[in-house]
């Protein structure tokens, strides 16, 4: 007999060889039905793995994040199974879980398009209803290679060859087998709420020199209600797509001459300036001085900073006069150079620097997505140089600033996470231990709840992440606060302590809105283009019922501009209904409509974008009304 301890501290006795599914059944049939896998002594295992010794057990159900991930990964296998049934000559490659779903890459021998997805989805449903048990076997590497080679799965053979392990797991459901680390669901019958969403091209291993594969995306949920809710959200997200709205509002465009880099138009720059000016004022409030540093630096600087060894594949390089240069992918190394121009005492610290720094990163062309994923962007970077004793206080101030900024921009629902050390990193474990604990202490001191993200920190230090929830429930990773003991040391940053000794300052990296391009894209989608008055590129459109009011329209327009209102004058010889409709489609918050009566009485008639009539008032009263709304960030 063995003893199994549960999360509530209770201990129960079972026969050796029992599995997690059996344990769940002994508690309740409904729990067994919901069980996807289990943590056995903190190791995630398949629900049917035998338990042969005393252990701690935590059952994973579809309600747990891990359970939903397992469900989606298993659905990717179901997709591959269906494809092999319908198109037997197809080679399967990889099928990972992604946000809200999964994808699988295939090498089809025939042409496949979006129109084929319903057929594949129908086959998936047929296979799921078979309630096929899902099992695995562990085989030597050579045997796995022979198994997949016999099936003509050359991509699987290549994957196995690239894995250092000598033992491979092969999962099987019905007549389909796939290479996978697992775990997977116990039975295909739990896959009931899924849908294939789109089809795209993808190079094998992300390398454009390799074969172009067909990538099929899908989504999978615990219940049909959850699936329906997600599909409704996708439909709403399509309406809010910043690329479409950006075109309608004439904000920006992209073209192949400069892939992944936006061309900003007048209206887009107006929004940009509001975001940048707001952040500049916020930085001033929190004691940051503003700097500006070079876009290009000698490659030796990036070698010293660690970027050359850890980030080279994302960097753009160039040569001049027999020297190697790199376009900066991050602003921090050049900021340190500003710090290093002076001798600093501990009394000078903390020193807070802010920069709206343009960076370039060589993102794969297939990953580019409007303003949300670009190759060139401007970061609202801040770098704070401080003593170890000042870290927690500085982080607390940064957290307060982040909360303040997000609320002003209309994001009131956000989560805080700490991304911990990744495998590919610089610095020793002792330094990482200290860094991670400092961030935890700062959040604890501020009574901020947070989630830990193992392995997701930057290569030079752990970071606090801010995830904002938008109007339709999507989560966006936005600002970061990163703690760095390594870079200031590598780049020779020092200060003189109270004993007259040289010390290396702690460097705090922070971005609040992050990429301005991405943040503006988020704002457009969050508000569906109906930006609040203080951010709107055009706040008021002035128009006359006929050309007889042109002079009065100009007079009102000038008065609005003198009061700092971003106004547009529409004197076109068009019907007033046409003008109202056009400016409504352009999401202008307020329309000023002037006719003979308004001209004679020197008043204005105001209509909101929503169609609500605000009646008549003087221009001065209207300006005061607008100013109050702008100051309140409404």
Curated annotation (Swiss-Prot):
Role played: Catalyzes the attachment of threonine to tRNA(Thr) in a two-step reaction: L-threonine is first activated by ATP to form Thr-AMP and then transferred to the acceptor end of tRNA(Thr). Also edits incorrectly charged L-seryl-tRNA(Thr).
CDD domains on file: TGS_ThrRS (cd01667), ThrRS_anticodon (cd00860), ThrRS_core (cd00771)
Reactions the enzyme catalyzes: tRNA(Thr) + L-threonine + ATP = L-threonyl-tRNA(Thr) + AMP + diphosphate + H(+)
One GO CC annotation: cytoplasm
PROSITE patterns xrefs: AA_TRNA_LIGASE_II, TGS
Annotated protein name in UniProt: Threonine--tRNA ligase
Binding positions for Zn(2+) per the UniProt entry: 332, 383, 509
The encoding gene: thrS
Catalytic activity, EC: 6.1.1.3
Domain TGS: 1-61
Residues annotated as transmembrane: none
Region (Catalytic): 241-532
Localization: Cytoplasm
Family: Belongs to the class-II aminoacyl-tRNA synthetase family.
């Amino acid at each position: 007999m063995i003893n199994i301890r549960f999360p509530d501290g209770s201990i129960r006795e079972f026969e050796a060889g029992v599995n997690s599914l059996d344990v769940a059944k002994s508690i309740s049939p409904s729990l067994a039905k919901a069980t996807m896998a289990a943590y056995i002594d903190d190791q995630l295992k398949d629900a049917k793995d035998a338990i042969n010794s005393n252990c701690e057990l935590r059952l994973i159900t579809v309600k747990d994040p891990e359970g939903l991930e397992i469900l989606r990964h298993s659905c990717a296998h179901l997709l591959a199974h269906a494809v092999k049934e319908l198109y037997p000559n197809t080679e399967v490659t990889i099928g990972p879980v992604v946000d809200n779903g999964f994808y699988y890459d295939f090498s089809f021998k025939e042409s496949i398009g979006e129109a084929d997805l319903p057929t594949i989805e129908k086959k998936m449903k047929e296979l799921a209803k078979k309630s096929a048990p899902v099992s695995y076997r562990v085989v030597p590497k050579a045997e796995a290679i022979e198994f997949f080679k016999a099936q003509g799965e050359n991509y699987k053979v290549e994957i196995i060859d690239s894995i250092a392990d000598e033992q491979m797991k092969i999962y099987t459901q019905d007549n389909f087998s796939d290479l996978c680390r697992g775990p997977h669901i116990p039975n295909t019958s739990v896959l009931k709420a899924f849908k294939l969403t789109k089809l795209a091209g993808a190079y094998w291993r992300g390398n454009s020199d390799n074969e172009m594969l067909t990538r099929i995306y899908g989504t999978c949920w615990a219940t049909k209600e959850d699936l329906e809710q997600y599909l409704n959200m996708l439909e709403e997200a399509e309406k809010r797509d910043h690329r479409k709205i950006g075109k309608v509002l004439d904000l920006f465009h992209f073209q192949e001459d400069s892939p992944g880099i936006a061309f900003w138009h007048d209206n887009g720059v107006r929004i940009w300036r509001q975001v940048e000016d707001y952040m500049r004022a916020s930085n001033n409030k929190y004691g940051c001085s503003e700097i500006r540093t070079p876009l290009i630096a000698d490659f030796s600087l990036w070698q010293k900073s660690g970027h050359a060894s850890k980030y080279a594949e994302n960097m753009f390089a160039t040569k001049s006069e027999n020297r190697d240069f790199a376009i900066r992918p991050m602003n921090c190394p050049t900021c340190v150079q500003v710090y290093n121009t002076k001798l600093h005492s501990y009394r000078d610290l903390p020193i807070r620097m802010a920069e709206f720094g343009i960076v370039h990163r060589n993102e794969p062309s297939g990953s580019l997505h409007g303003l949300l994923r670009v190759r060139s962007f401007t970061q609202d970077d801040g770098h704070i140089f401080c003593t170890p004793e000042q870290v927690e206080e500085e982080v607390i101030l940064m957290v307060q600033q982040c909360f303040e900024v997000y609320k002003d921009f209309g994001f009131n629902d956000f989560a805080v996470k700490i991304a911990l050390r990744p495998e590919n990193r610089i610095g020793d474990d002792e330094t990482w231990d200290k860094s991670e604990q400092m961030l935890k202490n700062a959040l604890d001191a501020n009574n901020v709840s947070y989630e830990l993200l193992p392995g997701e920190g930057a290569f030079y230090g752990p970071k606090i992440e801010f995830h904002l929830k938008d109007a339709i429930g999507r989560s966006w990773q936005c600002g970061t606060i990163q703690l760095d003991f390594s870079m200031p040391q590598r780049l020779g940053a020092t200060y003189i302590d109270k004993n007259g000794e040289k010390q290396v300052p702690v460097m705090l990296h922070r971005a609040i809105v992050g990429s301005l391009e991405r943040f503006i894209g988020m704002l457009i989608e969050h508000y569906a283009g109906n930006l609040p008055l203080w951010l709107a590129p055009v706040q008021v459109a002035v128009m006359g019922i006929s050309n007889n009011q042109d002079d009065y329209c100009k007079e009102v327009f000038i008065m609005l501009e003198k009061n700092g209102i971003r106004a547009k004058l529409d004197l076109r010889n068009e019907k007033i209904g046409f003008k109202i409709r056009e400016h409504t489609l352009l999401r202008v918050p307020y329309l000023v409509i002037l006719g003979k009566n308004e001209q004679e009485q020197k008043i204005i008639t105001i209509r909101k974008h929503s169609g609500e009539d605000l009646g008549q008032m003087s221009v001065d009263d209207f300006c005061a009304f607008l100013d109050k709304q702008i100051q309140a960030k409404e």
